[in-house]
Amino acid sequence: GVLAAGVLEDIPAEVNEEVIQTNLLGYIRSAQVVLPWFKQQKHGILINNISVGGWFPVPYGAAYSASKFGLRGFSEALKGELTQYPDIHVCDLYPGFLDTPGIQHAANYTGKAIKPAPPIGSPQKVARKVVDIIYDPQATTTIGATASFLKIAYNLFPALSRAITASVIRTYLKQANPIPATSGNILDPVDYGTSIEGGWRKSFIKTLGGKMLIAGLAAGLAGLTMGLMMGSRIRNLLS
């Protein structure tokens, strides 16, 4: 998928619309093309790489979040439509943050250089999961402990999760290097970032920004963990 980062009103409307076109409508159109063939042959596998963004919203990436939440809803509805076809499988992948050039390609209207949030996963791991699903279709596959944690945290404490995430992002942007606004690969192709990996895992903790973001995320995750534990204890006392 593609990402446009920034305060909502600072991002041109056509950029946000292209995010929806790529991340949501692209999947819908693809399904419309292949499903008649699947139904004719009575079997098939449709794999949607949604990302943890389908469960956990991204402040300063509102259109991206809309596309991912929308894609999750589309996929869930489609599974209902296909209950009469037990051998047609709709399989959703929810990986966490990956070491790809996606951030390099992103439209960026924050005025600052942005980086993926740690811990950063391997794209090869996701590729292996896709192969696994082809041989053993699963309706939902969450990849990585971080993705699983964020999903649970947002389901239990949505307001706290949003507040912590937004605070961490704002803290990072205050000290990040300034750069000019760019539409990235949203409106036009780019000739950079053509490798499989983005190189983020190797360089991240070497930078001050990386260390600060890691510290902020660690504090945020600790807060969410405490909230989860307290919520669990309260429910146990009331049960």
Label each residue range with its predicted role.
Residues 51:
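Residue(s) in the substrate-gating loop at a strand-loop-helix junction
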Residues 7-8, 12-20:
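Substrate-binding pocket helix/loop in short-chain dehydrogenase/reductase
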Residues 31, 67:
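Active-site helix of classical SDR
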Residues 8, 58-63:
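Active-site loop immediately N-terminal to the catalytic Tyr-X3-Lys motif
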Residues 33-42:
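A short helix-coil junction within the Rossmann-fold of NAD(P)-dependent oxidoreductases
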Residues 208-235:
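Hydrophobic alpha-helical topogenic segments used for membrane insertion/localization
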Residues 83-176:
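SDR active-site lid
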